[in-house]
């Protein structure tokens, strides 16, 4: 594995971390070739997380929009309510294989933290989750959930108290406790081999979706659309379609209050190339290379960078990256809830918002797959607040 996607990716880390990354890459490569390991991974995806997830034809929404057929890849139906568990099960099985006793993770929306705490509980491992102080306030429900699952939740006060700061803190902990600790990264970010490893554990989404659409429609979709924060749900559904040039891949970033306001998280639209968290990629940074504060209504999208493979897909024109505002995501959130009886995560609602713009301009013969990366239970408080409803 080269660890590079074109010029992106790499391992921009201190010496202290290098040995751990080399060990991790070696063990991951071995595990991937090991039939027993992959069999065990698939067993837990099936029996514990409930895969395969359905590819659901959103008939009401399709009729309402009057254009392309919209299918939803129902990652919201996974155990713990999002795609995160696909990756966590893989990494924690790897940690077990490497005889690590403790796992740590960063979390923004709390979904990755919950998934990590969940799997750690099942495999009987000690678990500590680092979470920005601001995110802790926004996601109190998920914080309590992690504690219920036996994890220790450590607030991160430095910087803006959000995801980027939680990652920094997790890396610091990992360096200190490298011998017995496994760092479970939650997205296709960080130094090599993480972006590749997370993608490989998430590609089950796209592998299933491809098989399912061929069964249902006898052909591949015209568009595959997914939201992009760090970008693991998107990379997971995109990857199996990359060689199918006729399938357009569209990543949707968070435009927050608007792309020109400075209150957004659209690293592809407004960022420049730099280095963060051990990787070279597109980042929201100032002239001096300082990371700028990011914002989105959805805590899971407010990451100031994007996975390096996405940066490469953009630069090589294989995928297109667009954005949706808070307002558009909220409208899509309400629409899906009321037309299909499915409450989506605010993250996924960004992808849906773009699909809902696109569909009416296409014909009834066109097919769109939207990755519904998570369910919206965690966001009900946020939405109520925006609507001025006291809970």
Curated annotation (Swiss-Prot):
Matching CDD domains: Trp-synth_B
GO annotations of cellular component type: cytoplasm
Intrachain S-S bonds: none
Family, as annotated: Belongs to the TrpB family.
Entry-linked PANTHER family: TRYPTOPHAN SYNTHASE, TRYPTOPHAN SYNTHASE-RELATED
Function: The beta subunit is responsible for the synthesis of L-tryptophan from indole and L-serine.
Keywords, ordered alphabetically: Amino-acid biosynthesis, Aromatic amino acid biosynthesis, Lyase, Pyridoxal phosphate, Tryptophan biosynthesis
Quaternary structure and partners: Tetramer of two alpha and two beta chains.
Enzymatic reactions: (1S,2R)-1-C-(indol-3-yl)glycerol 3-phosphate + L-serine = D-glyceraldehyde 3-phosphate + L-tryptophan + H2O
Protein's UniProt name: Tryptophan synthase beta chain
UniProt source species: Thermoanaerobacter sp. (strain X514)
Record-listed N6-(pyridoxal phosphate)lysine modification sites: 84
Co-factor requirement: pyridoxal 5'-phosphate
GO MF: tryptophan synthase activity
Pathway field: Amino-acid biosynthesis; L-tryptophan biosynthesis; L-tryptophan from chorismate: step 5/5
EC code(s) of this entry: 4.2.1.20
PROSITE patterns for the chain: TRP_SYNTHASE_BETA
EC primary class: lyase
Pfam family name, one: PALP
